[in-house]
């Protein structure tokens, strides 16, 4: 009997089972223990293969692929700390709902806890963060193939959102020519190999329940809060709110067009808060809200009913309002709860939104971080997409810009970490094949610097804007101790990214004014390659501009 040959047949069943559940993208890191899985994936023509040498980046690459494709994405890594490097992407997927299938190769049980090389306790290592966990036994012909395939099918059928961790121990030898070992075992699955359906088909449908009293609530004074959703849903939500005559507070990830722009500015005005207090119902569609003032208002508002609609399970309401948590796809829920044409009930908020926008426009000529956030709409590629980093940059865009309705916007706003942002953006581009603008801060770029290797393989123009404000300037917005701020919070690195771009053979520009930036962008959008554009800005201007605008708008 050939152990290596049977390992590969066992792995082939696993990988083929994944294809029956919509898996098309497989992300693979190098490793020896994962050889059976890697070869099975490489030999399966149903897969698009992606490779990366860094498992942390690989997990985020898969996350980006899943965001756009809306399909589960598989990840294959070897044993040991390679598995642990998937933790950040797994956590993010659990909070934002992307489906990741993590296939982690492992040593067999007799090599665990005995000093064997590259052997750690992998089973259950991700604690409660995966939505589903499956620890497979060592491959053996004593276990029928139908058990293996039905076990995979069952786990995937139960996966509504988040990650499925499948731990796969393999004994040596891992290499060798294929022979007939296990062929009969494999053939007992019959014509399943030629079919396209799962071996075990389980029905688990996410159904939207109609709120029978909606006809009553839609006649009341309401507020719509729009969080993370798809571009198509964003346009529908904007129209729905407009028909109802309800003010729409749109997050940067809502893709609603933010009809009342600069919400995180005007929500700091007491007149706006007073008017919003008249709302009898708040309907929040989508989660992961960004703006600080929005979150503060959400925490203190007390409508008669607060509804949260999202296809991700869980409460999703840190303020713990009295109301309803409705698990449904936003588009489906809107269809079941049509709007009734009514006149807008808010008067003060549209006025404040317009005045806030005028204050922002008045500062757009200065070459700086806040002004870039405001101008970002002008720099979006036609029929493209935007990826927004975390920390200060996403807050500035949320507060100061107005993105087009229905324009795709992506970000990692679940755990909101700065790790893996470039890798995620690379996955977003690969899954869509669209022109992509990504914008991150300098520390975020440093954190995921080796992901620049992924940007050598893009299928359309890709522009990475690195806003270099020399450190974590978001801490300038927080009451951090002045004497300790620079060393322990901001951590300026005093670096530039020209050498990093050159190392990976990427185009690079460092514009010093808006005309130079626009010229660099014009050239980048004509080239199906990646371009790094570094904006070196005054360290504190972005945070200070936001604070100044907040003060101005609060007194309107």
UniProtKB/Swiss-Prot annotation:
Catalyzed reactions per annotation? isochorismate + 2-oxoglutarate + H(+) = 5-enolpyruvoyl-6-hydroxy-2-succinyl-cyclohex-3-ene-1-carboxylate + CO2
Its domain of life reads Bacteria
Names of required cofactors: Mg(2+); Mn(2+); thiamine diphosphate
Q: Name one Pfam family in it.
A: TPP_enzyme_C
Which enzyme class, named as a word? transferase
* Cofactor details (free text): Binds 1 thiamine pyrophosphate per subunit.
Kindly give the InterPro entries that the UniProt entry links to this protein: MenaQ_synth_MenD (IPR004433), MenD_middle (IPR032264), THDP-binding (IPR029061), Thiamin_PyroP_enz_TPP-bd_dom (IPR012001), TPP_enzyme_TPP-bd (IPR011766)
Q: In which pathway does it act?
A: Quinol/quinone metabolism; 1,4-dihydroxy-2-naphthoate biosynthesis; 1,4-dihydroxy-2-naphthoate from chorismate: step 2/7; Quinol/quinone metabolism; menaquinone biosynthesis
Q: Name one GO molecular function term.
A: thiamine pyrophosphate binding
* EC number of the protein: 2.2.1.9
**Transport as UniProt keyword:** no
* Keyword vocabulary terms for this entry: Magnesium, Manganese, Menaquinone biosynthesis, Metal-binding, Thiamine pyrophosphate, Transferase
Question: Could you provide one GO biological process annotation from this protein's UniProt record?
Answer: menaquinone biosynthetic process
Q: Does the keyword Manganese apply?
A: yes
- Sum up the protein's function in the record's words: Catalyzes the thiamine diphosphate-dependent decarboxylation of 2-oxoglutarate and the subsequent addition of the resulting succinic semialdehyde-thiamine pyrophosphate anion to isochorismate to yield 2-succinyl-5-enolpyruvyl-6-hydroxy-3-cyclohexene-1-carboxylate (SEPHCHC).
On assembly, the entry states: Homodimer.
Which protein family is named in the record? Belongs to the TPP enzyme family. MenD subfamily.
What is this protein's name?
2-succinyl-5-enolpyruvyl-6-hydroxy-3-cyclohexene-1-carboxylate synthase
The organism encoding this protein is Salmonella heidelberg (strain SL476)
């Amino acid at each position: 009997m050939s152990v290596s040959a049977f390992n590969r047949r066992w792995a082939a069943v696993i990988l083929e089972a994944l294809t029956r559940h919509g898996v098309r993208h497989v992300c693979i890191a190098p490793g020896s223990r994962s050889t059976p899985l890697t070869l099975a994936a490489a030999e399966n023509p149903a897969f698009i293969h992606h490779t990366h040498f860094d498992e942390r980046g690989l997990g985020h690459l898969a996350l980006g692929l899943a965001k756009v494709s809306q399909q589960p994405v598989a990840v294959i890594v070897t044993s040991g700390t390679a598995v642990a490097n998937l933790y950040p992407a797994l956590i993010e997927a659990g909070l934002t709902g992307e489906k990741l299938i993590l296939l982690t190769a492992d040593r067999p049980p007799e090599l665990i806890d005995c000093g064997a090389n590259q052997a750690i306790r992998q089973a259950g290592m991700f604690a409660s963060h995966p939505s589903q966990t499956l620890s497979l036994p060592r491959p053996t012909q004593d276990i029928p193939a139908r058990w293996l395939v039905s076990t995979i099918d069952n786990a995937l059928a139960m996966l509504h959102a988040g990650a499925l961790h499948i731990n796969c121990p393999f004994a040596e030898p891992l290499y060798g020519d294929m022979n007939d070992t296990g062929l009969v075992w494999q053939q007992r699955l019959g014509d399943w190999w030629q079919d396209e359906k799962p071996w075990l088909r389980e029905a688990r449908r996410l159904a939207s329940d109609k709120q029978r009293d909606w006809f009553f609530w839609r006649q009341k004074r309401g507020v719509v809060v729009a969080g993370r959703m798809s571009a198509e849903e964003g346009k529908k939500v904007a129209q729905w709110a407009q028909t109802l005559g309800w003010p729409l507070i749109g997050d940067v990830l809502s893709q609603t067009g933010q009809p009342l722009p600069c919400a995180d500015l005007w929500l700091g005005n007491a007149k706006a808060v007073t008017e919003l207090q008249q709302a009898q119902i708040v309907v929040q569609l989508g989660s992961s809200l960004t703006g600080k003032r929005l979150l503060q208002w959400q925490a203190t508002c007390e409508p008669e009913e607060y509804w949260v609609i999202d296809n991700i399970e869980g409460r999703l309401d840190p303020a713990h309002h009295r109301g309803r948590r409705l698990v449904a796809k936003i588009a489906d829920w809107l269809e079941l709860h049509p709007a009734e044409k009514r006149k807008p009930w808010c008067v003060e908020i549209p006025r404040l939104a317009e005045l806030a926008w005028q204050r922002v426009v008045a500062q757009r000529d200065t070459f700086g971080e806040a002004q870039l956030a405001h101008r970002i709409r002008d720099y979006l590629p036609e029929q493209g997409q935007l990826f927004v980093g975390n920390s200060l940059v996403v807050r500035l865009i949320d507060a100061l810009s107005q993105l087009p309705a229905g324009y795709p916007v992506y970000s990692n706003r679940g755990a909101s970490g700065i790790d893996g942002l470039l890798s995620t953006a690379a996955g977003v581009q690969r899954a869509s094949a669209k022109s992509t603008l990504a914008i991150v801060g300098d520390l975020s770029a440093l954190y995921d610097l080796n992901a620049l290797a992924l940007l050598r393989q893009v299928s359309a123009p890709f522009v990475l804007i690195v806003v270099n404000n020399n450190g974590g300037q978001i801490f300038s917005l927080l009451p951090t101790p002045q004497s300790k701020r620079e060393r322990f919070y901001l951590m300026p690195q005093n670096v530039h990214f020209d050498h990093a771009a050159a190392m990976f053979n990427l185009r690079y520009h460092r514009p010093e004014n808006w005309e130079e930036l626009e010229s660099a962008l014009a050239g980048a959008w004509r080239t199906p390659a990646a371009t790094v554009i570094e904006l070196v800005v005054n360290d504190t201007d972005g945070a200070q501009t936001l604070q100044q605008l907040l003060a101005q708008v609060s007194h309107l």
